[in-house]
């Protein structure tokens, strides 16, 4: 014990000595050292010591929604700077719109939250109290008899879709309604829905219901009124003070309206004002813009078949009788086409419309690639589905000519005739033993054309209704392989630049069994698969159709151009290609299979015959097509895709000079993603939000969500 106590005393003495040394060191450090103090001061600076210009520039990168609100609570200086940043954000965006100096941002899968269902003809508005965009109803392209009555909220701070499960009296499922903001309420009016499929021949149903939704209470309420407008859809509405002004709309049975109705939002009573002078033609689908508290602008609309309007009218709401005033539209040739299905939104002294680009052949916006995705730059790899695809897979409608490499067209079938060998010319595929490459999942059908001096006499086949179409998520390339591609979305049918999709005008066909020679054939001839398991795609052993007619030379020329486009990408791409049409066994332009069959090999080179070459955009892009933000796929599907462009209407001289003027832009930044119609455009804080819409089937674009796309338009930095 004594030894232990001695050791403890020694340890205490050592600790005391260490403390004494430390105290001496601290005493020495307390002596002033000007150099050390300056160094310490330089490394301990805070953001408050930064120049306000630098701090303001840093704060400008914050989101104009919740992040601005949070930053303003830091201190008085930040509160003052945030107010200036918000002012610059708003006015900078207005200036960018006037000059066409904008940038596009796309939100594609995967993004946070539950994905909203694809839809068009929906209603949307911006609610600033919770910094969200609300979307109600609409209908979907996949089910023509279905409409929605769901309500969705897009949190513009987190870009997350949220579905409020509200209580109260829900509206009916409908599309074509209007949704406006009044104080702390969202007011929903009108709309229509398709009838149920049974019994047949029922008319569409139109609504005159008024519902209000309270975001704070999460409650729907039905408002009962009397002596109001007839049931309508496709009308326009806006709120001025405590009045909701409604104009036009479709009444059903091909009837349009040009009446003006006013709803008192305090008393919930309808009235119809007296209006003097000429009035606009009855219409629906127009845009209604508030100029000031006593003036409303009506733009475009549709009055029925072959009655599309591009005019502009002012409604003066004076104390006396209201009056209509037609406006002169300048630079109408540079204006937005089809104003009836592309809504307008006011930004400062301009009205913005997103519609089809004038030429319809302009490349998609390069500004979509200007910044990485804010959600996920490298999305997780998606595993392709492994289920079997049977022959009843949906086949492209015969009346829809595909968009192939920038051109529209179909291959017309060739007439049959019996050959001495007993095989048919013009049948879906050759007799057993002929080597015929598969083109987009089908084989090649006979035809002749001159390519570089050689004749074309290879079998050519198109996809018939009895032949399985390409399963979703598969890359349709020229060759015998239909392997699924990693990272492709399950609901995509990928068509890269150079791939071909053939349509035929089918005629009554005779029974044959042309696919027997192709069921168990692979490129190397070393693998054998049963018909239902070949490359994961079911190939029916019996195809009971034979085509009559001749192959279009123009379509064959386009097919050859597609082969050259793919072969120009390098040896790896050329190895997967089918050989050129018309080669015979043992010829220089053929490759022998292990089974003794021969298929031609493509010979890359300049375009021949008609002098066509690769499209200019393909030559300019070379081996590096533009990439989308998230999926990493080319932004365009073919050169004939219709991009969406921003059109700007100057309205500053509306009241004084009675005219509006379309601006002319030379910048490519106004050209954006593929065109959609019947979408919604909502103005947020320093940005425009475009959601949903109906995409043209003939655009053949596979890398964008078809009708639930979400785009943001902001000022370019």
Swiss-Prot record:
Gene3D superfamilies: 1.20.1280.50, Kelch-type beta propeller. The modification Phosphoserine is found at residues 365, 373, 552. It comes from the Eukaryota. Keywords: Kelch repeat, Phosphoprotein, Repeat, Ubl conjugation pathway. InterPro entries: F-box-like_dom_sf, F-box_dom, F-box_only_SRC, Kelch-typ_b-propeller. GO terms for cellular component: SCF ubiquitin ligase complex. The modification Phosphothreonine is found at residue 378. Residues 416-426, 455-469 have a biased composition (Polar residues). Component of some SCF complex, composed of CUL1, SKP1, RBX1 and FBXO42. Interacts (via the kelch domain) with p53/TP53; interaction is direct. This is F-box only protein 42. The lineage of its organism: Eukaryota, Metazoa, Chordata, Craniata, Vertebrata.
